[in-house]
Each structure stands twice: as structure tokens, then as C-alpha cells.
Amino acid sequence: EFMSSNTKKDLVIVTGYQESKLYHILNNKYHFENDQRVKFVGTIYDDALLKSVRKNAFAYLHGHEVGGTNPSLLEALGSTSLNLLLNVGFNQEVGLDSCIYWGKEKNNLKHLIEHVETFDQDYIDTLGKAAKDRIKNAYSWTKIVSDYESLFLRKKDL
């Protein structure tokens, strides 16, 4: 759906794709090599560089729909102001109201990509602050350790 959108922005995909059969299957089907906006940049192992890519991205697009707390989503919330998430329970639980959600209905993501380009910077900054607050309040090591201490102390008293 990105390729059918009118956005002038690039879609930067950070992944090890070169030897992937799936990459070649999808490329044969969608011909994304013909869209100059689609950029596969490979895997980035340099943490500082990856943080810089996330921080300077216009938005983070998260299409995972299988359960649990996804580390890449947590990292994005901590560094990217505009986070576009597939609308499933796991993602909603993590992002709450700090993210914008899209569905799997035809053209839903396409329209969202075009719509978010109309957001003013103050709104994007507000979402970014909410995302960073969400990470700090629910997923920081301080919070996690405190929750485990409480759990273990309650178990000890039983």
C-alpha cells in the first residue's frame, strides 16, 4: 500500500534481505525495485546509527500482528515521534494513545500514510512525548525491576 500512496517520502526498510527467499518472492510480485522511494538498507548492527535512523525518521511503520511485547516497537516508541501501528491488541496495549493505528482493510494504510503527512509538527511532537512517556512509565528497567520486586515479595508472604 505504500507504493500506491502519493507520498514523496521514502520507505526505509532495515532488514537482512539479500539472501531471503521471501524478499525475492515479494519483489517478483510487487516489483518494489521499480519504486525509487523503497529503500532496503540491510541490517544495521551499529546501535548509534540505528538510533539515528529511528530518531530522524518521519515515522515508524509497525506491521507485526503476532503477540507479545515487540522490542523493535519499544525502541521505536522511545525514539520516533510518529508511530504507525497495525491495529491489533498487542500493539494497542503497548502504544496506547501515543500511536496512530491502521487496519488491514484495502487502502487503509495507503490513506493513513497520505493523511499523516498533513499533521502539524506540534501534534507529532505531542505523540512523540506520549510515546516516550509510555516507555518511561511502563517499560523502563526501573519499572520492570520494581514490578518484579513487588511480585516476589508478595509470593514470599504467601
Predicted feature locations:
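Short hydrophobic signal-anchor/transmembrane segments that target glycosyltransferases
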Residues: 1-9
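Conserved acidic donor-binding segment of nucleotide-sugar-dependent glycosyltransferases
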Residues: 99-107, 115-121
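A charged, aromatic-enriched C-terminal amphipathic alpha-helix characteristic of glycosyltransferases
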Residues: 125-153
